[in-house]
Swiss-Prot record:
Catalytic activity, reaction form: orotidine 5'-phosphate + H(+) = UMP + CO2
GO molecular function terms attached to this record: orotidine-5'-phosphate decarboxylase activity
Protein family: Belongs to the OMP decarboxylase family. Type 2 subfamily.
Pathway entry: Pyrimidine metabolism; UMP biosynthesis via de novo pathway; UMP from orotate: step 2/2
Annotated gene: pyrF
One Pfam short name: OMPdecase
Gene Ontology biological-process entries: 'de novo' pyrimidine nucleobase biosynthetic process; 'de novo' UMP biosynthetic process
Taxonomy of the source species: Bacteria, Bacillati, Actinomycetota, Actinomycetes, Mycobacteriales
Protein name: Orotidine 5'-phosphate decarboxylase
Keyword vocabulary terms for this entry: Decarboxylase, Lyase, Pyrimidine biosynthesis
EC supergroup of this enzyme: lyase
Species: Corynebacterium efficiens (strain DSM 44549 / YS-314 / AJ 12310 / JCM 11189 / NBRC 100395)
Amino acid sequence: MTQTFGENLLDAASTRGRLCVGIDPHESLLRAWGLPVDATGLAEFSRICVEAFADTVALVKPQVAFYERFGSRGFAVLEETIGTLRERGCLVVSDAKRGDIGSTMAGYATAWLDPGSPLSSDAVTVSPYLGFGSLQPVFDLAEEHGRGVFVLAATSNPEARVLQDQTDASGVSISQQIVNEAAALNAPHLAQHRAGNIGVVVGATLTDPPALSGLNGAILMPGVGTQGGTAQDVGTIAGDMAHLAFPNVSRAVLAQGPDVGNLRVAVSETAAEFPGFPRS
């Protein structure tokens, strides 16, 4: 039986903790690190991040857009970054936020989750706003290969509330519907006492988040660190799914680069802020 992404993530967390660190090589950060704003600078930035994070955190999240902006050379750097991280035992979620229908969605699924793809990752982020069912190709491939899918449910950007907080006739918000759909896909694994492959993205700064009890999948939680989310927030929102909650931090750690030692210290200090996700 193929081990699920949820199981792989819990295994990694048992030795590396429940922290996800983003690799976000945006232009201002490349400049701050004294690197050229081109594919060469991108490659050096990524190399430094791999050295700093590959053996210190459970989950690393490259932001695909910052590689895509450099075209084929950027994607070549991304391929190498993903491959090297995975070779060194670090789980990788590619933050691509893909969303489409039919054969096009199947193409995205193959690109990011098929073991034979040069971009093959442990997980990928996807957008459900063409309908949750439109994502079925990526769910199918995730189940086949034990890969993960993080579905955008309740994101931390303020613009999201006007859409994600809308409710149906029963008063259930769109974000809650997405969580419920993900939980339904994970239900067969719950019956086998295994964490499933389908996770959600839920911001750590939300005042009215969806209920996550029963999700049985990983929760990627942006909004901590620079954006103000705390361990208390993460624990309160995650509730009884806290063991599957992974706060995501990028800027607060990357600001300490480009020195590898300083980046590793920043990871250690940030992880210490989230040891047990205390709840009120």
